[in-house]
Amino acid sequence: MIHILKIKGTDKIPDFVQIRDNNLSLRAYFRADQIEGGLKKNNINDEQGKLMEYIKSIPFGKIFKFNENE
C-alpha cells in the first residue's frame, strides 16, 4: 500500500504529487501535470494505468491510500 498526497500550488509554484510508502517515507515527488514521467523516473510500475488515473481523480490537500494489488 502507498499513500498519495496531491498538493495545490500557487501562482508561481506548480501543483505537486507525493507518493509515500507504509512508513510514510517519501518514494516519489513530481509535478501533478507530469504524472507519467514522474512515475517512470521514480521506478514506480503502473502498467495498467490505475495509479495514474487514481492520482488524476483525487482532490488536493488530503492523504489517500492506494493498494497496488487492487
Language model: regions and residue ranges:
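Mixed-charge, Lys/Arg-enriched low-complexity segments
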Residues: 34-70
